[in-house]
Amino acid sequence: MSRKTPLNMVRNIGIAAHIDAGKTTTSERILFFTGMSHKIGEVHDGAATMDWMEQEKERGITITSAATTCFWKDHQINLIDTPGHVDFTIEVERSMRVLDGAVAVFCAVGGVQPQSETVWRQANKYRVPRMVFVNKMDRVGANFFNVEEQIKNRLKANPVPIQIPIGAEDEFKGVIDLIEMKALVWEDDTKPTDYVTKDIPAELLEKAQEYRAKMIEAVAETDDALMEKFFGGEELSVEEIKRGIKAGCLAMTMIPMLCGTAFKNKGVQPLLNAVVDYLPAPDEVAAIRGELEDGSEVVVDSTDNGEFAGLAFKIMTDPFVGQLTFVRVYRGQLESGSYAYNTVKGKKERIGRLLRMHSNKREEIKVLYAGEIGAVVGLKDTLTGDTLAGEKEHVILEKMDFPDPVISVAVEPKTKADQEKMGIALQKLAQEDPSFRVSTDEESGQTIISGMGELHLEIIVDRMLREFKVEAEVGQPQVAYRETIKKSVEQEYKYAKQSGGRGQYGHVFLRLEPLEPGSGFEFVNDIKGGVVPREYIPAVEKGCQEALQSGVLAGYPVEDVKVTLFDGSYHEVDSSEMAFKLAASMGFKEGARKAGAVILEPMMKVEVETPEEYMGDVIGDLNKRRGQINSMDERAGNKIVTAFCPLAEMFGYSTDLRSQTQGRATYSMEFDHYEEVPKNVSEEIIKKRNG
């Protein structure tokens, strides 16, 4: 079977945005105009085809990235929906891995929001070429040119409008296409799909010429031949302009800007044309790199001919077909009924049915080709971030890094009968979401779930009830504290037991030093002349690592410590790995007590947007929560306060903020860094932990 859509006509794109910029509506309209969904789903009435999990319908926020295939001008567009809420940045990160290009949607009123900055940073990290769609041009306070300024100043990017709006707010009629120099006008609101091409209104001609000149200059900079033409005063043809925009977009030196209002169906078809014209095909972006089993690096080119290599980027439980694993094929082809090798787990997987998802319908297919995205039914051992490969070349594609959770709660089922069901439910949810962890508290035997924020865990508990029919009681949220040391110390420890028969003997000298925040643990072997034999060194490191699990102040994990083993002694008969492990572990604990151990707490970056009259209350409240105010700005007539606040003080913040501001303020919060806890708070934490 040969492929229906040539590789150069495939587009893998994501729609990325802040929570209320209208991302789902934009995705919906794309599906509508590409002829996939006939009735337009509205987020307001909870029927959007992209948002296919029930809670999303209720909360009106998009949680899981569903990959949906649609067609426009003979191009296959695989649309990967990314969530905009900060607790789900892991989802965004995961979808950025498999995208070739992105459409960043901004609200014409709200502009660049804190969440947009996070998503933008992730897109930069994975070098994803993108364009901007300024949405909600019909809203009161809409201003396309303000958003352009904010993208320059806040995101430090180079936005180049290739359209400008005709009017704004209720007067928003359409857009001026600066490439063709024509006005595209939506005249009849009852027929949203039809627009007319007209001459540019006289009062906007000067502005259009000014912005076209800026665009041409940006285009000329992408190519020497175009630059010569430009400086020679020659006109660039439409083809040359388009070629230049694409080159700038792929090199990420310019970001084409378009506008419209997805809700009112204005500006969506030109956006689709731009996706096809300017965003890259799989073979136009840098090839993904992988490593072989011997550690050597290989480049995995996008081609149908090589051996199969693909990345599992998302796992979902589907009520009808069971577990779905979403796979992006980078090289070769994946056929249903064949076998693939999971190179991360070292296991062979049988490929069952292959599905292509159309927002909420599934189409069964026989083959997935390079550059395509689909879902595999029935994989047993494959998790998010695993590589699937052919039999010959066991390549591992770039691994994904997932952050450690910062918040935990204890959960128990309402009825004892649900205990086993809850275990299965949590295990399945943890398979789908690597930033969610499940563990058991050794002392109390309680099940502990951990994640990236309160909303994250609320949704997990909610999904247990909806999808697995398990009702759970949730305990008080617990903060993931850490411990570290402040000064360097040297510590000797001798572990010796002689009581008839064979004894135990291990003797170590350790140097403990604090490291920069975020460095983790480092172990250095500095033994000279074999005073501690080589075979016992790993046991010393292991002993230190075990001691790190539970700190000396309150039993929290210890981090950012360097341990050097610099001296010691051993006994020909009585020394053993066990003895050295115990000596190191106890030596580490004694040393840590002298090294000024302190407790660290997760600090959240909090941004509150509030009407001016509540500004004083908001700041006063953040100060009460031990917040450090960073900056105060203005956006769309509101005040913006940015602060770092300890997570421990932020539980229930949304309710308090609502009552302080009569529901008129909004906030976003994401983990930023760990910081030392003040002494009085530290004493309380220790007292609570040690009873």
Curated annotation (Swiss-Prot):
Chain ranges of the tr-type G domain: 8-283
Xref: InterPro entries: EFG_II, EFG_III, EFG_III/V, EFG_IV, EFG_V, EFG_V-like, EFTu-like_2, G_TR_CS
Binding site for GTP: 17-24, 81-85, 135-138
Record bears the keyword Protein biosynthesis: yes
GO BP annotations, alphabetical order: ribosome disassembly
Localization per Swiss-Prot or TrEMBL: Cytoplasm
Location (main, coarse): cytoplasm
GO cellular component: cytoplasm
Pfam families: EFG_C (PF00679), EFG_III (PF14492), EFG_IV (PF03764), GTP_EFTU (PF00009), GTP_EFTU_D2 (PF03144)
Molecular function via GO: GTP binding; GTPase activity; translation elongation factor activity
SUPFAM superfamilies the UniProt entry points to: EF-G C-terminal domain-like, P-loop containing nucleoside triphosphate hydrolases, Ribosomal protein S5 domain 2-like, Translation proteins
Keywords in alphabetical order: Cytoplasm, Elongation factor, GTP-binding, Nucleotide-binding, Protein biosynthesis
NCBIfam families per UniProt: EF-G, PRK12740.1-3, PRK12740.1-5, small_GTP
Known role: Catalyzes the GTP-dependent ribosomal translocation step during translation elongation. During this step, the ribosome changes from the pre-translocational (PRE) to the post-translocational (POST) state as the newly formed A-site-bound peptidyl-tRNA and P-site-bound deacylated tRNA move to the P and E sites, respectively. Catalyzes the coordinated movement of the two tRNA molecules, the mRNA and conformational changes in the ribosome.
HAMAP family associated with the record: EF_G_EF_2_B (MF_00054_B)
Protein family: Belongs to the TRAFAC class translation factor GTPase superfamily. Classic translation factor GTPase family. EF-G/EF-2 subfamily.
Annotated protein name in UniProt: Elongation factor G
UniProt organism field: Campylobacter fetus subsp. fetus (strain 82-40)
Gene: fusA
